[in-house]
Amino acid sequence: MRAALALVAIVASTGSLPKAGMLVPGQSLGGVRLGETAAQTRAALGGFYGRCHGCDGTTWYFTYGKWTRTGLAVELHNGRVAALFTLWKPPGWHTAGGLRLGAVEAQVTSLAGPVVPVACAGYTVLVRDAHGTRTAYYVVNGELWGFGLMRARANPCRT
């Protein structure tokens, strides 16, 4: 009986990638905040993730299933979250202000406030720095493709 209760407690405390994740600009993405520990991240998003083998630092890919592309990437530095960004264009992801992935670029500039464009290879990132944090809006062919959160002035371009 104790073993069964312990198992229920473990399962209940295990998080998972949100089905319709939210960006709170300057604060969190998918329920994860910059500076959280690796353990806090796994508690929030669960233990199902892949590791990037070609990345400079430790990067985890939380996806909706094995061999699926959409989800959330978490970059860690010294065991803490240093950057977050969506993978591909996960359906249903949105901002606290109602901006949804798939929106046209004009909606981003209207709803996100003042942003600065950064040219990357094949796409543009509209960034806004505030309170030591950079919120990134990834735009491909005039359409909002993804969200990101990192330290202010960090390079938002991802490969």
Residue positions per predicted region:
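Bacterial Sec-dependent signal peptides at the C-terminal "C-region" and cleavage site
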Residues: 2-22
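Generic low-complexity, intrinsically disordered sequence content enriched
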Residues: 9-11, 27, 49, 148
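Generic serine detector
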Residues: 13-16, 28, 110, 135
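Long, compositionally biased, intrinsically disordered segments
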Residues: 18-19, 25-28, 36
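Second-shell loop/turn segments in exported
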Residues: 25-32, 92-99
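A cross-family detector of function-defining hotspots
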Residues: 36-80, 99-159
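Eukaryote-biased recognition of intrinsically disordered, low-complexity regulatory segments
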Residues: 82-86
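Extracellular beta-rich ligand/substrate-recognition surface
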Residues: 88-90
